[in-house]
Structure formats: C-alpha cells, structure tokens
C-alpha cells in the first residue's frame, strides 16, 4: 500500500472536511464534499490507514474527529468482511491511539474522547469475551498510564453498559453473552471503579488548595467525575451485593463526596440511583445505613451548604438531586418497614422528617412539589402513620401546605422568593401555571391524608385561617383584570390579586379538612358548635367582589354538613345562595354581564343543586319555601339566564324525588312544566320548529349584524327556546323513582314485572316529556337541515358562521394553552356572532342529551313510542352528509350510545337494528373518505409545498376532528358489540431482574372479550355485519394509533369469530388478513399497536389458513419473507400431530415471518443496518455453572483473535 496514496487521499479528505465545516461554504460545495466523504467511507479499500492518519494528535480537532468517524464506520459496517490480521491491526492501532495519540486530559476535546471510546465499544460488542478474553486486563493496563487514559477507560465502560443494558442496541445472543460476562466480572470492575474514584479523590483533596498544582488537581477531579458517571451507569442494574459490599463502602464514599463541591452532583446522582433500586426487600435492607448518624449528617450538611449562598444554578441542581435522594430514602423505608419485617423505624426518623420538611418549605415550587408523593407514602403507611414522630410533624406539614397552596412564584413577577427559582425551572407563566395546578392537586391529595391522621388540629387551623381571611381588608393589588369599576370597595380582584390567591388557597384547605373530618371522626366527636360558628361568620360576610364571593360560596358548601346537626340554619344558607344567584356588581346595570359575575351566579346555582342532591331529606321540610322563592325569581323573565332558571328547577325536581309518591310528584312536575309546555306546544313555536325558514327568522340569523351594545331583537326568542330545551333536559335528567323497591311499590312507581322477575318502573315525568317529544324531534330535524348549503346561504353576515365551532373549542381540541388571566371584567360574549354560536352549540347538544337521557329515564315508556325508529331516523339522522364532525361526535356520544345501551333486548330488532345498520354503513363511508383525503394531503405535502406552520391551521383542526370522530365511532361499535368477561392481565410488567427476552408480542389482547347479545343480534343482519367488519378492519390502517390499538385488542377478533363458523368468501378472507398487515405497515413503529396487530394477524392466520389457501398467497407477497420458514410454519400448522410448540414460540416465529411488512419509525427507515454476528455461545442455559469454567479455560478452545 503506497504511503503517497494515503497522503494524497488524506489531503483531499482534510479539504472536504474543512469545506463542510466552514460556515462560508456554499451549499453546492458542502454537498459535494459530503458526497466525497461518504463515498470514501463506503468504498475506499484503504479507510483504516487514512482514518488513523487523520486521527493523529497533530491534526486539528475536526479532522481528528472525522478520522475517528472513519474508523468507527469500518468497525460498524465492514468488520464482518475483514480478515483476522486486519482486525488485530485496527484494534492495536486504536489502543495505541488511546495510549499515546491523545492530548492531556484538560486539553483533549470531549468529542474526540467520545469518538475514541465508541470505536473500542463497537469492537467489544463484536468480539468480547470469546475472541478478546483479555479486554478488561488491557483496559486496566491503559488506565495505569495516566489521567487521560483512565478517563477514556471510564468512557468505554460506561458506553458499554449503556449499549448492552440500558439501550440494548445489539442482537439478543451477543447482549446476553456480554451482559453475563460483565456480571461475572462485576466484582473486579466495581473494585476498579471504586479504587479509581478513591485514588483520584484523595489526590485531588491533597492538592486542590495548592495553586501551583491547580492543573494536577483539575485532572484528578476530571477522572473522579468520569468514575462517578460510570458508576451511575452500573449501579442501576448490578447485583445489590456490589453496592452494599464491604459494609456499604460505596455508599459511604458517596456520602462523603456530597460535601466536595466539584464532585457532589455526580455523587448525588449515584446515591439517588442506589437508593431508588427495586428488587428483593432482603437485598435492600442495607440501604437503611443511610438513616445512620454519619450518612444523615453528610446529607443534611450538604443541603444546608448548597442552600446557604442564595440561588446559584449549580447548587440548585444539586439541591434537587439531594431532595430526590431523601424522597427515595423515604420510599425505601415505607417498602422495608412492615408488620412481617425485622426492619425497625430508624432512630434518626425525626431528624429525617425535619430535614424533609425543610424541602417542603423551600421557596422553590419544584422542590416543594417533589416531596409530596413521599409525604403521601409516609401518611398512608400502616406503621409509620401511627408513629409519634410523624404525628408530631403533621401540624408543621399542614402549616407548610397553607403557604404552598397560595399560587405565587410566577417567573415574570417579583412578589415572592419563589419567582427567582421559577425563572430557572419554567419558560413562561403558562408553564408555571400548568405545573402549579397539577402540583396543587397532588398536594390536596396528600393534605387529605394528613387531615385523616389528625382531623381536629387540621380543623382548628382551617378555622383560624378562615377567620383571618374574613377579617382582613381586601387587597386587589396592582395587576388588575378590572379597570376601575366603582363598587365602593376600590377596584375588583383579579386572579393574581394578593387577597384572591389567599382566599383561594384557604378555601381549598378548608374543603379538604372538613371532608376528611366528617369521614374520620365519630358523629359525637364532630365540633358542631365551632363549625356552626364558622358558617355564621361566612353567611354574614358581605362582599361585592365576584372572585371573593365565589370563594365564600365554596366555603358555605364546605361547611354545609354542620347544618345536618342544626337544620334551623338552612333558611339562612339558602338566603345567602339565592342572593348570589341574582348577584350583580352594579345594581340595575344594563351593561352586559361580565364573566366573573356569570361565574358567581352559576356557582350559586350549582351549590343549590348540590345541596338538594346530597341532602334531599334535610331540605324536604323547606320545599314550599324554596318553591315559592324559585317561582318568584322565574316570574321575571329578564332576571336570570335560561341556564340559571333551569338549575333552580332542577333543584326542586331533586327534592320532589323525596315525595316518594308517584301521583304527588307527577302533579308537581305538571305544574312546574306548565310554562314550558305553553311555550313549546304553541302553534307559533310548532311552526318555527318545523319550518327552517321560520326558524332562521325566529332566532335572528337572517338579520344584519347589529351593535352588541344595542338590544338584540331576537334575543328573547332564543332565550325562550333555550329555556324550554334546558327545562326538558333538567326534568328528564333529575326525575327518578325511589331506589328502595318497597318504597317504590308503596309510592306507585312499579307497574309490573318482566318475564325474568325484574320490576318495571314508571317515571313521573314521562307524560310531560312525551307530549313535548314531537316538537323536540322537529327542532332536531330543522337544526340538522340548517347545515345544507342552500340554508346557510339564507343567513346574513356575520351569522353565516353561526354554526361554526367556538374559538375556545378549537383551542381545546388543538391543545393550545388557555389565557392565564381570564378577563373577568370582559362580557361573557365578546361579539353577537359568539353569542349566536354558543346558542346553536348548546341547543344542539342539549337536544341530543334529552334523547340520550330519555331511554334510561323513561325506559319502556320511551322505547315503546309508536314508530320510534322511523321518527328518530327522520329527525336526528337527517342531512348527516352536511353535519360537521364536531357536531356528529357529541351526537354519537350523548345520544346514540345511551339509546342503544339502555334499550331492552325485546326492542333490538324493531329499534336498534334499523338505526345502527344504515348508521354504521354511512359512518364507515364518511371516515374512509376523510382518511383518504388526509393521506393524500400528507403525500402531496412535499418540499415545495410546505405544510402550514400555524398551529391553528384549519388542516390540523380538521385532522384532529377526524381522529376524534374515528375514536367515537370505534368506541360506539365496541360498546355495542363487545363485553369484557375478565380483566386483562397481559400488560403486567416482567419481574425485576428477569433476563428473558421479552417479546413485544407479550402485550396480547384479552381473550375473554365476547360479543354482547346486541352484538350477536346486529351480526345476524348481513348489511350490519358487513358494515361492522369493514369498519373495524379498515380502521386499522387509519392514522390514529389509539383507535387502532383499541380496535385491534377489543373488537376485531370477537367480530370475526362470530362469522368463522359460516362460509366466508375467499376474497373476504384475503381482504381481512391484508387489512391487518396494512395496519402493521402503518402502526408497526408503535410497540403497543404492533404487538396487538401481530397477535391478531397470528390468530387469523392460524384460524383460516387450514381452510383458505388464498391467505398463504398474501403471506408470500410480504417483502423479504423466507419461503422455507413459511413452509415449515405451515407444515406444523396444518399437521396437528406436529403442532405442540408453545403458543409464544409460534407467535414469535410468525412475527419473524411477517417482519417485512411491519412499519418502522421514520428515524430507522433510512438508517444503514448494522450487522453484528453471533459468536459461539459461552453460556448454556442447562448448565449455568459452566460459565466460569469457560472463562477460566483460556477461551475454552475458541479462537482468540486479540492476543494481549
């Protein structure tokens, strides 16, 4: 090989690399240089000498790195074709580079070290231990040469562990060989790592204060850091005996290093991994040494030092790790301490709790939040929750919670010490807000556990806080959502106001405490007098601030259980709530109501409903008083919104359920619904509901847009229509018969019994609702017709978009963050269009809610309505072609699903089949077309036609809606057709330390899923059966992973099993099997989907191959299929006497057969495949003891190509 050839090539390569890395190079030159370099790596026969020449330390760093890349490429892609001598030469050359071809540890670039270690690891993966038995000895020898070499050895050992154990980037047999050899040599490796760490730490500590030896100290420190990083890669999976060897020497060293500033972070990482270990409890017991005096001292002093000098990022990151260490330590204690365990509560448990509490009270929201799960584990623990030390710290924990519940610390603000830390942890106020909300929900859970352990102290603290807030002057702060609205109390609060954040936190605290107290204490232990005193104070508190009033209402609801002991306070409670139902910030204001005011009024209505639902017996004696009050409010048409009116009616209906007398309740409902019936059944209304043109004129969508501030001429019409629909829904939803059968009989609710002996009930609202049903169906028919293009053309600007989605709905579907500061002073609807959109959206959904509730509410009285199927088909299912996805989806969910699920079996043929047959056929056709459009769109979107970058783009919204509709349809089919007989245990995780190959096909669908009676009924009808099968199997190739996963695992096989006994057309069998393979092509990159689809394909092939040869023809078309392997598989399948292989083995074989059609992730589709050959196996499963013999026998007779 001529050296000048190498020199010439190297010169060209240096130029090419320089061009590629030069920012001033043109795109054309850069591409040419890249092409030259890639072709060189692929084709040049003298890659190794060129790579070695370029990697010499005399070259510049980018050239050296490219030289090392060439060598790595040779090992990865050419190794199998190299001779023994070539391999030995390359190995020796690389080892020489490490020994003498690298710069000083402090000068050498990290990417050079990384590239060198990668080459060695790639060789190890191909040759160790069989052909390179002395690899560890060679690394040991290298490490003795100096700090640079020692650090490189650390890199090699770490990367080897990552590739073999963590990422598992090599074939199973090689992985097993290497991992088992590593395990056998672990004592040696571990002692090497520990000695390296100790030696370098000792040297570093000796010279770190000597300025003349600064570089020496830094070199030792760098090796120490590398040793800690490498240990972190092993601690996670090696046997616990190595971690706890020599009286927990490793843990001791790590604790000592916590106070060594340059090494403390790496030490904390190692400690965290060690303390977080799972596995046998017996093996983990030695970890309790960390509760000892010495370890505790080092951990706590390190925390104090790190937190002492203010906020420094490096120290703060370390503090986070230490916090995690304490969390993991607490979780280990909870796991190890049990009734049948000999582990005792540590003597330093009190000190641990105090130090842990220090993290809970730290200004950093992240640190506070990190401690919550461990507090939860401690408070739940059977033994620790009774420990006096833990009980003593609960008041302190609750005091900390009181502070932590207050929403402060936004990164953009400076009103709290938390803000500074938040600027490190969160990119924006929105990020902080999302984190804080989820963290506060978790804290609420833990707080409730603490309250359960000490309910009286908790209640006392909550009471004090409530009294304090009631007596404190309101501070709206400087950041206001409200422009000066004169209320006599200064400006109103915003969600950021100092008063509001305190009220909000106190309200959450009080709610949690009282709920737990009533659950925990006996009736006679409840502090009734104190509770009533607090309730009176809240009832007497008066405020005109809507946000504060909302908190006050929550406190009234929270304290309401005390009224069960003193019912005489009930009228006062209702008086407070009713005054809030009509709340206004400015009396007799003609201005539009603001969001804050609307929220208060809704809150008051909800509270009334909640009390009537949860305490109907308590409220019943006051029924007449309530009824009169509601009638008075309803008499003024403009005083309440339609939703508020109906909420109050719902509350009355809930109490009327306590009459437990059919006739009395029926008379009451008749009276309550009389105003609704008179509007709804009038001739004018009938004309409006039945005629689309009349409807458009009535609701005002043909009017030119008027000023939002002026009177809306059709507003009252829409209000009346909404009132009727809301009222019908409220009555249908809330009216029910007594749950107790004897009470139901006595009250006249039972009208007979079914053939199986179940009682048939009648609902007091049936008569009222059924007479309103015709007009309701007319409204639904008219509403559906509105979407026809010719009807939309009749609407005036801006109401042409009246049927569109609201912007808030679009944002929710696209997952866009909501604005942080809801503009509480802004009107509920910003524009007349927005008001109209909300009207149509609510009206549409409520109509279908009524139909959905009618079945479960009225039962046989609804299902026996004459020609019900025809009536529904001619109203709810009219003009579906023009109904958008966002309207069709709620219709399926709130109407079709309950209609079908609650239908008695005797009405399946007359009602369900005539509706679902055409519906499923239509839905399949619609979804297929939509997915076809989406697929074509993604194919057309090439480089020239870039996709719209706008996250709110219409295409993204449409695609997401199609996805959501698909899920709704598949869910409807599954609910109708499939019942799950048993829980699916297949997804249980493998046991710790299980070294068996876990095939992804282990995630199998539940074999217990069977067809329901309705499913069987539907499958009897050929048109419905075809629609169901085609929809289910076609959906496997639609671009929605979640839908595919559910359909594959729950629906496909039960449906197919139903038709297997009959005769299937060969074309149908081919299509079904091909559909599953297409699904694999689309979703094979997702492990869960791939496992379910492989299992389904396997089931179909096994069931149908013996009867249909055509299915074999499909298999033969799979790319790269091994025909001989397929023949063997078929032979075993078709010959029952041979078929004794375990199901898992057969499935694995089948998966290998169809591997050619399993889709890959985009990142792997164009990656060049690396082939690592298996070496003769060292380890035979039958005789595990031979492993050591093989190693000790100088390679056991195997050819060793790498001689030392």
Curated annotation (Swiss-Prot):
S-S bonds: none
Subunit structure: Component of a nuclear export receptor complex composed of XPO5, RAN, dsRNA-binding proteins and dsRNA. Found in a nuclear export complex with XPO5, RAN, EEF1A1, and aminoacylated tRNA. Found in a nuclear export complex with XPO5, RAN, ILF3 and dsRNA. Found in a nuclear export complex with XPO5, RAN and pre-miRNA. Found in a nuclear export complex with XPO5, RAN, ILF3 and minihelix VA1 dsRNA. Found in a nuclear export complex with XPO5, RAN, ILF3, ZNF346 and dsRNA. Interacts with EEF1A1, ILF3, NUP153, NUP214 and ZNF346. Interacts with RAN and cargo proteins in a GTP-dependent manner.
Phosphoserine: modified positions: 826
Tissue: Expressed in heart, brain, placenta, lung, skeletal muscle, kidney and pancreas.
GO cellular component, one term: RNA nuclear export complex
Entries under InterPro entries matching the protein: ARM-like, ARM-type_fold, Exportin-1/Importin-b-like, Exportin-5_C, Importin-beta_N, XPO1/5
Keyword Nucleus in annotation: yes
Modification type N6-acetyllysine: residues: 396
Localization per record: Nucleus; Cytoplasm
Site (Pre-miRNA binding): 441, 448, 718, 1045
Biological role stated in the UniProt entry: Mediates the nuclear export of proteins bearing a double-stranded RNA binding domain (dsRBD) and double-stranded RNAs (cargos). XPO5 in the nucleus binds cooperatively to the RNA and to the GTPase Ran in its active GTP-bound form. Proteins containing dsRBDs can associate with this trimeric complex through the RNA. Docking of this complex to the nuclear pore complex (NPC) is mediated through binding to nucleoporins.
Protein's name according to its UniProt entry: Exportin-5
GO BP term, example: protein export from nucleus
GO terms for MF: mRNA binding; nuclear export signal receptor activity; pre-miRNA binding; RISC complex binding; RNA binding; small GTPase binding; tRNA binding
Region (Necessary for interaction with Ran): 2-108
Ranges where the record places region Necessary for interaction with ILF3: 533-640
Keyword tRNA-binding: yes
Family membership: Belongs to the exportin family.
Residue numbers spanned by region Pre-miRNA binding: 641-642
Keyword line: Acetylation, Cytoplasm, Host-virus interaction, Nucleus, Phosphoprotein, Protein transport, RNA-binding, RNA-mediated gene silencing, Transport, tRNA-binding
Main location: nucleus
Residue numbers of N-acetylalanine PTMs: 2
């Amino acid at each position: 090989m001529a050296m000048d050839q190498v020199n010439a090539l190297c010169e060209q390569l240096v130029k090419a690399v320089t061009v590629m890395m030069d920012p001033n190079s043109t795109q054309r030159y850069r591409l040419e240089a890249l092409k030259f370099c890639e072709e060189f790596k692929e084709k040049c026969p003298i890659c190794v000498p060129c790579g070695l020449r370029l990697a010499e330390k005399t070259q510049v760093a980018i050239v050296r790195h490219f030289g090392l890349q060439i060598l790595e490429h040779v090992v990865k892609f050419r190794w199998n074709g190299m001779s023994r001598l070539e391999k030995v030469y390359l190995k020796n050359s690389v080892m020489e580079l490490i020994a003498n071809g690298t710069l000083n540890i402090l000068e050498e670039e990290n990417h050079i070290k990384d590239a060198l270690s990668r080459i060695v690891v790639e060789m190890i993966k191909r040759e160790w231990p069989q052909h390179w038995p002395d690899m560890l000895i060679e690394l040991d020898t290298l490490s003795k040469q100096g700090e640079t070499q020692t650090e490189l050895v650390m890199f090699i050992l770490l990367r080897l562990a990552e590739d073999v154990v963590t990422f598992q980037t090599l074939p199973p047999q090689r992985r097993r060989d290497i991992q088992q050899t590593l395990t056998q040599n672990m004592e040696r490796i571990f002692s090497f790592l520990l000695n390296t760490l100790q030696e370098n730490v000792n040297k570093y500590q000796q010279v770190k204060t000597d300025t003349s030896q600064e570089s020496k100290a830094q070199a030792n420190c760098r090796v120490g850091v590398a040793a800690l990083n490498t240990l972190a890669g092993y601690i996670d999976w090696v046997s616990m005996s190595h971690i706890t060897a020599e009286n927990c020497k490793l843990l001791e060293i790590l604790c000592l290093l916590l106070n060594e500033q340059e090494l403390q972070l790496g030490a904390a990482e190692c400690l965290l991994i060690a303390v977080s270990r799972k596995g046998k409890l017996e093996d983990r017991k030695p970890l309790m040494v960390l509760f000892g005096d010495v370890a505790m001292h080092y951990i706590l002093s390190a925390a104090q030092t790190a937190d002492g000098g203010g906020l420094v990022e490096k120290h703060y990151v370390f503090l986070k790790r230490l916090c995690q260490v304490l969390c993991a330590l607490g979780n280990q204690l909870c796991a190890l301490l049990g009734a049948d365990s000999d582990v005792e509560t540590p003597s330093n448990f009190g000190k641990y709790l105090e130090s842990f509490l220090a993290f809970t009270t730290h200004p950093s929201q992240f640190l506070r939040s990190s401690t919550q799960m461990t507090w939860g584990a401690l408070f739940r623990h059977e033994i620790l929750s009774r420990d006096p030390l833990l009980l003593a710290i609960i008041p302190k924990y609750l005091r900390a919670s009181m502070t932590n519940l207050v929403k402060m610390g936004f990164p953009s603000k400076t009103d709290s010490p938390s803000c500074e830390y938040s600027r490190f942890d969160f990119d924006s106020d929105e990020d902080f807000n999302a984190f804080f909300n989820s963290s506060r929900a978790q804290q609420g859970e833990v707080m409730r556990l603490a309250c359960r352990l000490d309910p009286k102290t908790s209640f006392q603290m909550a009471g004090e806080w409530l009294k304090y807030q009631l007596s404190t002057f309101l501070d709206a702060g400087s950041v206001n959502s409200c422009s000066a609205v004169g209320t006599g109390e200064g400006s109103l609060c915003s969600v950021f106001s100092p008063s509001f954040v305190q009220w909000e936190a106190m309200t959450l605290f009080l709610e949690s405490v009282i709920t737990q107290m009533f659950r925990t204490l006996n009736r006679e232990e409840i502090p009734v007098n104190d509770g009533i005193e607090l309730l009176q104070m809240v009832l007497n508190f008066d405020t005109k601030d809507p946000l504060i009033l909302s908190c006050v209402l929550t406190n009234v609801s929270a304290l309401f259980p005390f009224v069960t002991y003193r019912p005489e306070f009930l009228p006062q409670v209702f008086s407070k709530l009713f005054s809030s139902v009509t709340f206004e910030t400015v009396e007799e204001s003609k201005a539009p109501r603001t969001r804050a005011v609307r929220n208060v009024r809704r809150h008051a209505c909800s509270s009334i409903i909640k009390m009537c639902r949860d305490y109907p017996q308590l409220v019943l004696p006051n029924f007449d008083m309530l009824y009169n009050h509601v009638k008075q409010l309803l008499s003024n048409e403009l005083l309440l919104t339609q939703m508020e009116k109906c909420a109050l009616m719902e509350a009355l209906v809930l109490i009327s359920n306590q009459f437990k007398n059919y006739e009395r309740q029926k008379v009451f409902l008749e009276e309550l619904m009389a105003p609704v019936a008179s509007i709804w059944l009038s001739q004018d209304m009938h004309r409006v509901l039945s005629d689309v043109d009349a409807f458009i004129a009535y609701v005002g969508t043909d009017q030119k847009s008027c000023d939002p501030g002026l009177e809306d001429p059709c507003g009252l019409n829409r209000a009346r229509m909404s009132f009727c629909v809301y009222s019908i829904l409220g009555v249908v939803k809330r009216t029910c018969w007594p749950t107790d059968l004897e009470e139901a009989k006595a009250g006249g609710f039972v009208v007979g019994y079914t053939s199986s002996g179940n009682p048939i009930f009648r609902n007091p609202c049936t008569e009222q609702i059924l007479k309103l049903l015709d007009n309701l169906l007319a409204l639904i028919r008219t509403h559906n017709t509105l979407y026809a293009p010719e009807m939309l053309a009749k609407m005036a600007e801006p109401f042409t978009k009246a049927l569109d989605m609201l912007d808030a709905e679009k944002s929710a579907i696209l997952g866009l963050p909501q604005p942080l500061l809801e503009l509480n002073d802004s009107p509920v609807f910003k524009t007349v269009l927005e008001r109209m959109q909300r009207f149509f959206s609510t009206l549409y959904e409520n109509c279908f809610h009524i139909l959905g509730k009618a079945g479960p509410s009225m039962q046989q009285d609804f299902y026996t309505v004459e020609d019900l199927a025809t009536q529904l088909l001619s109203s709810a299912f009219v003009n579906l072609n023009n109904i958008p996805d966002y309207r069709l989806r709620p219709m399926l969910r709130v109407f079709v699903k309950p209609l079908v699920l609650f239908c008695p079996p005797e009405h399946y043929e007359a009602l369900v089949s005539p509706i679902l047959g055409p519906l499923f056929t239509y839905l399949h056709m619609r979804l297929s077309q939509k997915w076809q459009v989406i697929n074509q769109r993604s194919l057309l979107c090439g480089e020239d036609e870039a996709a719209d970058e706008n996250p709110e783009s219409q295409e993204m919204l449409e695609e997401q809606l199609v996805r959501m509709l698909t899920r709704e349809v598949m869910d409807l089919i599954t609910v109708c057709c499939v019942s799950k007989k048993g829980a699916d245990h297949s997804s249980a995780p493998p046991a710790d330390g299980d070294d068996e190959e876990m095939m992804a096909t282990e995630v199998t669908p539940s074999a217990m899923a069977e067809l329901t009676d309705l499913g069987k009924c539907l499958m009897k009808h050929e048109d419905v059966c075809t629609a169901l099968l085609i929809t289910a199997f076609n959906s496997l190739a639609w671009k929605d992973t979640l839908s595919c996963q559910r359909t594959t695992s729950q629906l496909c096989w039960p449906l197919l099993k139903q038709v297997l006994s009959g005769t299937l057309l060969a074309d149908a069998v081919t299509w079904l099997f091909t559909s599953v393979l297409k699904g694999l092509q689309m979703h094979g990159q997702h492990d869960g989907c791939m496992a379910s689809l492989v299992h389904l394909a396997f089931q179909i092939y096994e069931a149908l191959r013996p009867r249909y040869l055509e299915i074999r023809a499909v298999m033969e078309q799979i790319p790269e299929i091994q025909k001989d392997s397929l023949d063997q598989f078929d032979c075993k399948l078709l010959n029952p006497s041979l078929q004794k292989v375990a199901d898992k083995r057969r499935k694995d074989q089948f998966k290998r057969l169809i591997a050619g059609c399993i889709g890959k992730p985009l990142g792997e589709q164009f990656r060049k495949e690396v082939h690592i050959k298996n070496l003769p196996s060292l380890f035979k499963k039958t005789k595990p003891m031979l492993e050591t013999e093989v190693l000790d026998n100088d390679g056991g007779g195997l050819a060793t190509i790498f001689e030392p």
